[in-house]
Amino acid sequence: MFKKLIATAVATVLLAGAALADPIEGFWQTEADDGAFAFVEVVPCGETYCGTIVRTFNADGEYESPNIGKMLLIEMAPQGGGEYKGNVWRPSNDKIYIGKVTIDADVMKMRGCIAGGLLCSSQTWVRLQ
């Protein structure tokens, strides 16, 4: 009986930990940019979140991009309400933008700006299951 109680308690703690994961954490598919898209893994990095390219695809299928392992989302700090602020790297022009991310269930809306917010670009990513 005691072993069952311990096993139930451990399972409850493990499941609660998974349920408490931040909404931004996980694997996401980027929107196509210059004909290519990527799978990005978002994980905690200190008190913020970072997203690293783990797989890349183009019209011919999966390919070994030199961008694999590079960080797209940089130090995204939670702002509450599913919003995050940090920096976003755009591989197609190798520029870093001031970034804002909003998570709504399995959709990530991202906006990257330069020149104090005068020039902005946006993308919508979807969570991979």
Protein language model features and the residues they cover:
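Cleavable N-terminal signal peptides
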Residues: 8-9, 19
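Sec/Tat signal peptide C-region and signal peptidase I cleavage site
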Residues: 15-21
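Short, solvent-exposed mixed-charge patches
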Residues: 128-129
